[in-house]
Swiss-Prot record:
<keyword id="KW-0963">Cytoplasm</keyword>
<feature type="binding site">
    <location>
        <position position="56"/>
    </location>
    <ligand>
        <name>[4Fe-4S] cluster 1</name>
    </ligand>
</feature>
<dbReference type="GO" id="GO:0051539">
    <property type="term" value="F:4 iron, 4 sulfur cluster binding"/>
</dbReference>
<dbReference type="Pfam" id="PF04055">
    <property type="entry name" value="Radical_SAM"/>
</dbReference>
<feature type="binding site">
    <location>
        <position position="82"/>
    </location>
    <ligand>
        <name>[4Fe-4S] cluster 2</name>
    </ligand>
</feature>
<dbReference type="GO" id="GO:0005737">
    <property type="term" value="C:cytoplasm"/>
</dbReference>
<dbReference type="InterPro" id="IPR013785">
    <property type="entry name" value="Aldolase_TIM"/>
</dbReference>
<keyword id="KW-0411">Iron-sulfur</keyword>
<keyword id="KW-0004">4Fe-4S</keyword>
<dbReference type="GO" id="GO:0016992">
    <property type="term" value="F:lipoate synthase activity"/>
</dbReference>
<feature type="binding site">
    <location>
        <position position="293"/>
    </location>
    <ligand>
        <name>[4Fe-4S] cluster 1</name>
    </ligand>
</feature>
<dbReference type="GO" id="GO:0046872">
    <property type="term" value="F:metal ion binding"/>
</dbReference>
<feature type="binding site">
    <location>
        <position position="86"/>
    </location>
    <ligand>
        <name>[4Fe-4S] cluster 2</name>
    </ligand>
</feature>
<feature type="binding site">
    <location>
        <position position="61"/>
    </location>
    <ligand>
        <name>[4Fe-4S] cluster 1</name>
    </ligand>
</feature>
<feature type="binding site">
    <location>
        <position position="67"/>
    </location>
    <ligand>
        <name>[4Fe-4S] cluster 1</name>
    </ligand>
</feature>
<comment type="similarity">
    <text>Belongs to the radical SAM superfamily. Lipoyl synthase family.</text>
</comment>
<keyword id="KW-0408">Iron</keyword>
Amino acid sequence: MTAVTPDGRKLLRIEARNAQVPIERKPAWIRTRARMGPQYHALKELVRREGLHTVCEEAGCPNIFECWEDREATFLIGGDTCSRNCSFCQISSGRPQPLDRDEPRRVAESVARMGLRYATVTGVTRDDLDDEGAWLYAQTVREIHHAVPGCGVELLTPDFHGRPELLDEVFSARPEVFAHNIETVPRIFKSIRPGFRYERSLDVLRAAHDAGLVTKSNLILGLGETRQEIRAALADLRSAGCDLVTITQYLRPSIRHHPVVRWVEPAEFEELAAEARELGFAGVMSGPLVRSSYRAGRLYRAAIASRTDRRTDGATTQAPQTP
């Protein structure tokens, strides 16, 4: 009998191979404690009352309590189906739905209703569209800036195949932070992210840096990389002009996904954070439960503090007016 996914899709060959490895037992340090303060409760009630949707809740992020207490949240745009298939990601891949051109307005409205100080916007790849979703990403930033003056926006995008005209469209919206995640090291990159290219991802970050944007990326550990390869990838990111970096532990979403090769101990995350700072990153978040959008507003403010002399379009880059 042919194995299928919960939604009825036939397993890909790589998924079938992954499924032969049982789900790994998590170590004791992969724990989070729920601290539900007044801001979290207020935001939770607002989301329930208004019928809003965030990645924070729908993906079961372990950091939701901390981020919501700081009025930070993450939104997913472009639908719930990705046109590429990364072996670590729980988002479904396949033929995406038709583009919803009203989505940017609705996301901005949600940000306003939630009273966010900082919003992260990410999305699926849309290789089915002529512009690969560049307009959608850019317009969402513009709508949030218009609806909620002073709210910082972090935009986490795919690579748009490195097409300069599409990158320029996204850069023109001037997000406070432009993020593009390399996720892993060159040796295993193709097997982990077959629809992407390591050097192309670095080129995207370099282009954003050259456009005067604060840039950010993420590395996931536990996929089969070595410590030396991690250090080299961090150096590659800095050479590309990356300002901020998050370093995270891979947690396997299901038996179909890439197995966890190793559990990285908290002490190693601390060592890697120190190494990243020595390389010159303006902001670093490194830990087993860190995610790429974890405390995104705090990292942005760290970058601004270290780049007060940087000029963008003839004006000093300014942080949004948040506490």
